[in-house]
């Protein structure tokens, strides 16, 4: 929560008089795809039951009607339960984990057609795609065999590549709402505790699952942003 407040303070105090900016909040759910739990890319019913919402703050710098720089901090809360898996083998194994990822993201957002916040003579709805680079801090997990639970043994500092699709619309002269779905390919195979020896050599802990594939985490949610800055004179990049 402190990170979100700090980010909102920085981006709202950095206003210049040349471009149009957006700053706001993010709320949704984060699904995990790896070696523990369900392999479904979306599982909204589970998040409603487990109350594992993800939240964060986002800032966009609209550099032209077709693209923007975007920066975000999101606290992803995810989990996996083998008994919810479609795999009989996983159901019999019975592992479970919970993990929390603090994600710092920088990227580019491309609009499918021109997005002009200052033109309200026509409906302002546009689909978009975004990618970039994420850095995250998560728990480095390992198995606690008697309890069949994967628990924290260290910190996991790593990167991920996001691919995000969304649609956004201006609901007033100052507010924009967006729905987006984004998959993150992580540069680690241990968000679920299946490969604890990835960065730590522990003789008594054995890795399991597919060691040739890294983990994914998938976020789906809504953003609400407030726009500020005068009507822009767009640059050439």
Where do the protein language model's features map onto the residues?
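Outer-envelope beta-barrel architecture signal
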Residues: 19-23, 65-69, 100-102, 123-127, ...
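Residues on the lipid-exposed face of transmembrane beta-strands in outer-membrane beta-barrel proteins
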Residues: 25-29, 57-61, 106-110, 131-135, ...
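Outer-membrane beta-barrel translocator domains and adjoining extracellular loop/strand segments
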Residues: 35-41, 81-88, 120-122, 140-148, ...
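Extracellular loop and loop/strand-boundary signature of outer-membrane beta-barrel proteins
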Residues: 40-47, 90-97, 147-153, 207-210
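Gram-negative (and chloroplast) outer-membrane scaffold detector with strong preference
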Residues: 61, 65-144, 228
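Predominantly the C-terminal beta-signal and adjacent terminal strand-loop region
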Residues: 171-237
